[in-house]
């Protein structure tokens, strides 16, 4: 039975996130007058985003066309695929489609943010067919580090638009992690119009090390440990957590988790049967001291840098629950991103100083949850797409993936390297990239959504780098005189007691500026404040080569 609904006229593919970056996945596919959102993820802030908690895609384009949106389709349950859903649903109404575990994690996110909105959830699997006016949508099982991951297939009259989600190929994994290569091959034979595919490891040659080999290595490493064992692991890597549980059970060690980020997702997945946990294996963290050190494993978990931060606090004897002791062994079951390498190196030194032994990783093992070069080429060769769109990676990774596609037979002119907001448009004859829609980042700080922009970040950088300089003056405008002050206050700029001459010079300059302003025919407070900013900034820079944030405060009596 054909899954094509009707002859289509117009197709648009628009990345709003997940290109030029490893996170924040969001891809819009429009077929005629229907719009479909593929993933809705978040990103954790970069170092320069001071005070920002998370980053989500700007969905202004979707809001402007919300009547066309038929649903949010989710590939898997990681935050960079589902983390923005609760924020989006506060702004628009849309049904949400995903696997059983993925939707359970979305609902938990909604609950944790106290988003009380009635949402239509549709649980899908590899057998599901979702029927719409212009297209049908089906799904296929993929392998990732979290169970129930899906690829998404939009059937059009030109062929299928396939979104792989984040994937790798590993035949050693079974059950909830087994890739459905047979169904992928069927989709390829039916005809793939465009393949939107994960580029994260496009620069890594070969294949990933099979997970059964990795588990064997973990066992060999743990079996040599005589004392307490601490494992650093991402809360999102369910495969690695299961392997640590398996190994601990074989070695007759109890397991305890250290890290709040894991608690909700782990408990949800555990209740739903996605973890295989022997009876009495787990113990509360406050009971670890009741067991001999050679009979426990502590898994320090979290998102992004949280596991490393926990280890650092433990090494410095500052952790609220547990600290490193002489004779502890530490195993890092995480892959270091570029911006984490220095932090990890510093933490390892702290751990060694505190008396811990760092279990070395086998350099021959490459344990990623994303496909390496040969796995990416395998997906391309299975799907045989007419057009290819590399996503989910930094731009250099997208370029590397584009090269793999070309080597696999996709013509260069049919490979599209896109940035956020680019519109790939097919009108029935030609596929072109000649439009752009509104796109970018929405920064979330606490409960504020989108109220932190470039100007706020600039101010935070100024405060962090050069401090703040405040000049307070009280005026008597009726008599055109200074009633009190100027009073100078400074934080993070200079040590006031050692800079009394500079403070006096600044005070005199403020007085001079204010008195000049008071002599004007019409007193303009804004002009006086701006003159204070400009002239004080110049004075301070000439003396210190620093540019603190200058805040004039003028009050009246």
Swiss-Prot record:
Record function comment: An RNase that has 5'-3' exonuclease and possibly endoonuclease activity. Involved in maturation of rRNA and in some organisms also mRNA maturation and/or decay.
Organism: Staphylococcus haemolyticus (strain JCSC1435)
Superkingdom of source: Bacteria
Family, per entry: Belongs to the metallo-beta-lactamase superfamily. RNA-metabolizing metallo-beta-lactamase-like family. Bacterial RNase J subfamily.
Statement: the UniProt record of this protein carries the keyword Nucleotide-binding: no
Pfam families, per the entry: Lactamase_B, RMMBL, RNase_J_b_CASP, RNase_J_C
GO-annotated cellular components: cytoplasm
Compartments, as annotated in UniProt: Cytoplasm
Assembly: Homodimer, may be a subunit of the RNA degradosome.
Molecular function in Gene Ontology: 5'-3' RNA exonuclease activity; RNA binding; RNA endonuclease activity; zinc ion binding
InterPro entries xref list: Metallo-B-lactamas, RibonucZ/Hydroxyglut_hydro, RMMBL, RNase_J, RNase_J_2, RNase_J_b_CASP, RNase_J_bac, RNase_J_C
Protein name: Ribonuclease J 2
Record's keyword annotation contains Cytoplasm: yes
């Amino acid at each position: 039975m054909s899954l094509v609904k009707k002859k289509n006229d117009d197709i648009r593919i628009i990345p709003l996130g997940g290109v030029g970056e490893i996170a924040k996945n969001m891809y819009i596919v429009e077929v005629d007058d229907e719009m479909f959102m593929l993933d809705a993820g978040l990103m954790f802030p970069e170092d320069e985003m001071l005070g920002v908690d998370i980053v989500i895609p700007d969905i202004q384009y979707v809001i402007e066309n919300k009547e066309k949106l038929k649903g949010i389709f989710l590939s898997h349950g990681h935050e960079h695929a589902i983390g923005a859903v609760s924020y989006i649903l506060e702004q628009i109404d849309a049904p949400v489609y995903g696997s059983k575990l993925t939707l359970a994690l979305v609902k938990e996110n909604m609950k944790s943010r106290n988003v009380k909105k009635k949402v239509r959830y549709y649980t899908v699997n590899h057998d599901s067919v979702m029927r719409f006016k212009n297209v049908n949508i089906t799904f296929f099982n993929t392998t990732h580090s979290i169970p129930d991951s899906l690829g998404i297939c939009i059937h059009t009259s030109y062929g299928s638009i396939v979104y792989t989600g984040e994937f790798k190929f590993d035949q050693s994994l079974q059950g909830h992690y087994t890739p459905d290569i047979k169904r992928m091959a069927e989709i390829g034979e039916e005809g793939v119009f465009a393949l939107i595919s994960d580029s994260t490891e496009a620069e890594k040659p070969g294949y990933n090390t099979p997970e059964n080999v990795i588990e064997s290595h973990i066992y060999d490493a743990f079996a040599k440990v005589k004392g307490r064992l601490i494992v650093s692991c991402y809360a999102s890597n369910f495969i690695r957590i299961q392997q640590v549980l398996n190994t601990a059970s074989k070695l007759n060690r109890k397991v305890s988790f250290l890290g709040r980020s894991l608690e909700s997702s782990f408990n949800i997945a555990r209740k739903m049967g996605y973890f295989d946990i022997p009876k009495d294996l787990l113990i509360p963290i406050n009971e670890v001291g009741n067991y001999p050190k050679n009979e426990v494993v502590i898994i320090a978990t979290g998102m992004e840098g949280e596991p490393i931060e926990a280890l650092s606090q433990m090494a410095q004897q500052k952790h609220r629950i547990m600290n490193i002791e002489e004779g502890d062994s530490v195993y890092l079951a995480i892959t270091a991103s570029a911006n984490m390498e220095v932090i990890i190196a510093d933490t390892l030194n702290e751990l060694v100083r505190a008396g811990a032994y760092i279990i070395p990783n086998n350099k021959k093992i490459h344990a990623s949850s994303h496909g390496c070069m040969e796995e990416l080429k395998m997906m391309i060769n299975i799907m045989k797409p007419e057009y290819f769109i590399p996503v989910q990676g930094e731009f250099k990774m997208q370029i590397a993936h584009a090269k793999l596609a070309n080597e696999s037979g996709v013509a260069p002119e049919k490979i599209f390297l896109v940035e956020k907001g680019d519109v790939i448009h097919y009108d029935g004859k030609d596929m072109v990239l000649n439009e752009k829609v509104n796109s970018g980042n929405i920064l979330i700080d606490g409960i504020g959504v989108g109220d932190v922009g470039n100007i706020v970040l600039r101010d935070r950088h100024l405060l962090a780098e050069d401090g703040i300089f405040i000049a307070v003056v009280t005026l008597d405008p009726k008599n055109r005189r200074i009633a009190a002050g100027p009073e100078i206050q400074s934080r993070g700029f200079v040590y006031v007691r050692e800079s009394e001459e500079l403070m006096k010079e600044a005070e005199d300059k403020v007085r001079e500026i204010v008195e000049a302003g008071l002599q004007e025919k019409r007193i303009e407070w804004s002009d006086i404040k701006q003159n204070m900013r400009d002239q004080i900034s110049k004075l301070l820079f000439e003396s210190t080569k620093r540019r603190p944030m200058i805040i004039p405060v003028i009050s009246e009596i």
